[in-house]
Amino acid sequence: DVYKRQVESSYNGGWYGQCKVIREYLPSTDLPALIENYLLINTDKNPMFVEIPVINNRLYTDPRKGVDGSYLIEMKIDRNGYFSIQPGDTLSFSAYITGYKKGQPALVINGQQEKLKRIEAVTSWMDNLVLETPDPIIDRMFAFSKIRACESIYETQGGPMHGPGGESYYAAIWANDQAEYINPYFPFTGYAVSYT
């Protein structure tokens, strides 16, 4: 599945019960956010009791390293409390990390809505400019390249820019890459952000 990353694990807590945890990791398609959706499934024959703490961690980045000074990084969980999960039932919740410039209002993230938006975006990229060769590995590599290309567009002071990434140079240009390879490719993806 090209639009989500899912990790599944099992937990046997002895007297506390058994459960399965499914975690999905995804970036927001239009917000400065990374989302983690959790499903906690009671695989035991007895009810399971779970406490989700209130989490609202905030930190500020070094103002000398930001274009606009210090940024606020916020980590939250959208659900908290004490829950009883019956055998076979599922408890779902989301955690997310967001980033803000000074003075920007806080975001309220709905993890399931973000997942649906991502599925829609990636599906549209996969439906456009499809490579079909005798080798399914090459076809899959090309499909993944569309995700990599479309998700490497960053908002800069000069407007949206495609960049190589690399953790230090997000708003940098590798001129030959942009001019020779990616810019002619973008209109065929159908992703309006890439060519407007």
What is each stretch, according to the model?
Residues 2-6, 196:
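Conserved small/polar residues in nucleotide/adenosyl-binding loops
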Residues 6, 22-26, 93-95, 146-150, ...:
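Secondary-structure boundary/capping motif
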